[in-house]
């Protein structure tokens, strides 16, 4: 499961997620990608499920890049515990995602294969996404 090796603090405030992504909102590595259209927290398990779906469909051809990493600790109090008495114990890590953030990128496969693989990955994620293609992508010359 994805999580940081070491964190400076064990607990973190929730924070607010307003506005669109200011960074990580353009394709940087591949020709294809999926872009988030809403604000949500994505867990390491969800990212891993999406990664497995993509690699299985692409049959280990091409290359993929995961552009998000779960580095925000989430706490939870046990069941049947009253309010107060301090913050709960750390339960796991999430990656905060805002609209416009690129989640996964792919390269080295035909357009149809990339579109279907990233559609399968998007089904594993809790956010609505949009399939995007690099602006200078030429379908005629890319017969991978």
UniProtKB/Swiss-Prot annotation:
| Keyword terms, alphabetized | Ribonucleoprotein, Ribosomal protein, RNA-binding, rRNA-binding, tRNA-binding
Q: Where is the composition biased (Polar residues)?
A: 14-24
Q: What domain of life?
A: Bacteria
Q: Which InterPro entries match?
A: Ribosomal_uL16, Ribosomal_uL16_bact-type, Ribosomal_uL16_CS, Ribosomal_uL16_dom, Ribosomal_uL16_sf
By its UniProt entry, which Pfam families does this protein fall under? Ribosomal_L16
Q: List the disulfide bonds.
A: none
Compositionally biased intervals (Basic residues): 1-13
* Chain intervals for the UniProt region annotation (Disordered): 1-24
Give the GO cellular component terms, alphabetically: cytosolic large ribosomal subunit
Decide whether keyword tRNA-binding is in the record: yes
**What processes in GO biological process is this protein linked to?**
translation
Extract one GO molecular function annotation from the record.
rRNA binding
Fill in the subunit field for this protein: Part of the 50S ribosomal subunit.
**Family classification:** Belongs to the universal ribosomal protein uL16 family.
> According to its UniProt entry, what is the function of this protein?
Binds 23S rRNA and is also seen to make contacts with the A and possibly P site tRNAs.
Tell me the NCBIfam families matching this sequence.
rplP_bact (TIGR01164)
Protein name (Swiss-Prot/TrEMBL): Large ribosomal subunit protein uL16
> Which organism does this sequence originate in?
Phocaeicola vulgatus (strain ATCC 8482 / DSM 1447 / JCM 5826 / CCUG 4940 / NBRC 14291 / NCTC 11154)
